[in-house]
């Protein structure tokens, strides 16, 4: 088990158990996804929470101010606990591990779809059906990302399977084929 997992797994497992005991699992999972997005978008938040200079009480006060009323009390207490234990800098990794454990517990496959442009709801629904058939399961969660470097099309990753239907992927494959010919 990688070192990061030895740190994150006990916290993620304990938090999932707390969520189950309070019957807040679905709410906690939705909040975890929102906080992960905020964490990714806010370098200021990451830097402040990861700073060894900022005292624990200041970090807890900041968490209270930012998240009070926006997350369940158990989620806020969990983040404060991470701050007390000097682990708040690992919040994103703990929440990612929490989501992994949740998906594993419920046999949910994660499909990461990277497209050149944002997909509308109809495109998402059509893609979901196709990915479900490829993945062999109807229990699937889509993680949508946008990467303009793909030029057009999309790339789907489900576990170890990768479907590259992007224009940049086609150009790359064509270049490899041309290299074989010459």
UniProtKB/Swiss-Prot annotation:
Question: What are the protein's GO molecular function terms?
Answer: proton-transporting ATP synthase activity, rotational mechanism
Q: Which UniProt keywords apply?
A: ATP synthesis, CF(1), Hydrogen ion transport, Ion transport, Membrane, Thylakoid, Transport
Can you name a GO cellular component term? Answer: plasma membrane-derived thylakoid membrane
- How is the protein disposed in the membrane? Peripheral membrane protein
Mainly localized where? membrane
Which SUPFAM superfamilies does the record match to this protein?
Answer: N-terminal domain of the delta subunit of the F1F0-ATP synthase
Q: Which domain of life is it from?
A: Bacteria
Q: Which Pfam families match?
A: OSCP
- Entry's localization field: Cellular thylakoid membrane
Record HAMAP family: ATP_synth_delta_bact
Q: How does it assemble?
A: F-type ATPases have 2 components, F(1) - the catalytic core - and F(0) - the membrane proton channel. F(1) has five subunits: alpha(3), beta(3), gamma(1), delta(1), epsilon(1). CF(0) has four main subunits: a(1), b(1), b'(1) and c(10-14). The alpha and beta chains form an alternating ring which encloses part of the gamma chain. F(1) is attached to F(0) by a central stalk formed by the gamma and epsilon chains, while a peripheral stalk is formed by the delta, b and b' chains.
What does the UniProt function comment say about this protein? F(1)F(0) ATP synthase produces ATP from ADP in the presence of a proton or sodium gradient. F-type ATPases consist of two structural domains, F(1) containing the extramembraneous catalytic core and F(0) containing the membrane proton channel, linked together by a central stalk and a peripheral stalk. During catalysis, ATP synthesis in the catalytic domain of F(1) is coupled via a rotary mechanism of the central stalk subunits to proton translocation. This protein is part of the stalk that links CF(0) to CF(1). It either transmits conformational changes from CF(0) to CF(1) or is implicated in proton conduction.
Q: Which family does it belong to?
A: Belongs to the ATPase delta chain family.
Q: Which NCBIfam families match?
A: ATP_synt_delta (TIGR01145)
According to UniProt, the name of this protein is ATP synthase subunit delta
Q: Please spell out the taxonomic lineage of the organism that makes this protein.
A: Bacteria, Bacillati, Cyanobacteriota, Cyanophyceae, Synechococcales
